[in-house]
Amino acid sequence: MSATLALTEQLIARASVTPDDQHCQQIMTERLAALGFECETIASHGVTNLWAVKRGTDGRDGKLLAFAGHTDVVPTGPLEQWTSPPFIPAHRDGKLYGRGAADMKTSLAAFVVASEEFVAAHPDHRGAIAFLITSDEEGPATDGTVKVVELLQARGERLDYCIVGEPTSTTELGDVVKNGRRGSMSGELVVKGVQGHIAYPHLAKNPIHLLAPALAELAAEQWDAGNEYFPPTTWQVSNLHAGTGATNVIPGHADLLFNFRFSTASTVEGLQARVHAILDKHGLEYTLKWSVSGLPFLTPRGELSGALEHAIRTETGITTELSTTGGTSDGRFIARICPQVIEFGPPNGSIHKIDEHIEVRFVDPLKNVYRRVLEQLIA
């Protein structure tokens, strides 16, 4: 069994359901400390975070490449539906099964073993290697990576490159990497009406009827056309509720929850202003509460993308696709302090599902790609 596969199994065996790290980071810390990493645990409200760094011969003047990821996993769902227990690593048909196998304990193990091999081969490496690991990525993500980033900002720490080990591949290792992500902004809209008897509508104001024309306009609006890297911004309703459940009462208010997934072609302020303009045009009496969970980020083609594409092509023969599709990730926080952030990891077809797994044939090539990037950028 390879070192990467063995460490992956060791991590899967820890039932680290968010935000409980279950000592996964301790396992990683022991391996990294043996290489000369300075390891720091940063705890926050039940969340465990790790910042570990090993400087090269150039000291703080050297380029720094960070590996970022999360030790927490999503809940298992019904245990009886799993073919084998989710926290007991199991091999079947060339696949390793277990919660976190794809998202993202294989990436974590590959980070560690790639670093071990790199340091052994290049003991006098010039640049620095760092690890930014959290147990709060699958949860609220309020005490994880964002807290470490804030701390590093306060210290003036500089990151030059960051690889986030998210499972970005689709069918083959390296067929897709993410060089950016859309932003996410949600709104909680309450449209006020006047409750009344449904037989006397002239004595009431139906907020559903009042909202409907504005809702149709919002749904039809083209917010932007996207750009070279991003598809057009989307606006979607996730929840709509009004009424008491009775059939003879006009509701007093209508509640609407919606979400923007937006690109670098739009801004938070611009989208908010356009929503308010549409609501105001329809004469609605309303309240609207906004929450921004992440801004869009983009890493244009450059040193990191070039090194990663070359490493993937050398290791697998695949020409990779740069993509910005999908949901948000912790990359949105890291981009605040790092100009080049790219996500790359194993195929994602089984993530968050019953019988999550990774094909064993991808495990060591994943580690090799990470090591090749280290060799290209900081040796």
From Swiss-Prot:
Zn(2+) 2 binds at residues 103, 138, 352. It is an enzyme of class 3 (hydrolase). Zn(2+) 1 binds at residues 70, 103, 166. The active site is at residues 72, 137. It catalyses: N-succinyl-(2S,6S)-2,6-diaminopimelate + H2O = (2S,6S)-2,6-diaminopimelate + succinate. One of its GO terms (biological process) is L-arginine biosynthetic process. Pathway: Amino-acid biosynthesis; L-lysine biosynthesis via DAP pathway; LL-2,6-diaminopimelate from (S)-tetrahydrodipicolinate (succinylase route): step 3/3. Keywords: Amino-acid biosynthesis, Cobalt, Diaminopimelate biosynthesis, Hydrolase, Lysine biosynthesis, Metal-binding, Zinc. CDD domains: M20_DapE_proteobac. Catalyzes the hydrolysis of N-succinyl-L,L-diaminopimelic acid (SDAP), forming succinate and LL-2,6-diaminopimelate (DAP), an intermediate involved in the bacterial biosynthesis of lysine and meso-diaminopimelic acid, an essential component of bacterial cell walls. Belongs to the peptidase M20A family. DapE subfamily. NCBIfam families: dapE_proteo, PRK13009.1. This is Succinyl-diaminopimelate desuccinylase.
